[in-house]
């Protein structure tokens, strides 16, 4: 009966996930995820309490959920697709139930605006970041949760067993470390100076991976950063009437994509070192940059029109003339766009990226190879 139940679940999942590869029953029992707005499923909105937030209202959530859920997207985000591929319910955000929740299928610690490095790191550069909930803070929440999930585990055996059955998603993280420098910079903060942050950010991500392995994690997904030179908010902010030579053959900002590539090369090297140091762990390097560039290079293949404009926003060449909120213009069916609100991607784009990570086109090894 167990085999037939599993096969039945796989068939249902294949229908629900459209073109995603079928899931694997029992591959992982839970997912724990860390990161920023790319995978936040409600922590930021919870932190805002009764305050106003555009993420609490439509058109956010309009596609799949038909209402706002705290996801900064028109529908599902990457962690949702990974959970469904492994026959798990959608992973809940940590903060709404952090004191009482049992989280049988895992928890999502990601918070919009989170950085990899703690805010104190940037004070030496006379720079500040707006959110204090960096990667280290999120891992601290995770450790507190583990103590609740495995009380009295003096030797750590219960926690190790729990984590051995779990997938850890470490990001994407680090993107905001660079975003806040680029977006809020001035003459005293030239963009080139951000290159100095790359070694420290990558090393911090690496030490976080090692810390999680020390706790008992055995399967960790480590994504790289997106091609920020193709993001509408960057294009509207940094191109304008600049030299056309600033754009590459895809009409993305050459310097910023080169910068993302430098970060990603350093991260891939760090993941290689971590693999050599931890042969018993499965460390999966996910190429979000490469997967996202497929949408830019071959938009028609995925039913995308112009991949460099936002679906929700205002006027202007990149639809970034106004913020995406309940008064904004939705320029069409989000499934025909790669970008949702000028910064974050659409459910359709995340589905394409997830498929590439699950089947291995943009992951080493494939996420579904568990």
Spans of model-derived segments:
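Conserved active-site regions of diverse hydrolases
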Residues: 2-370
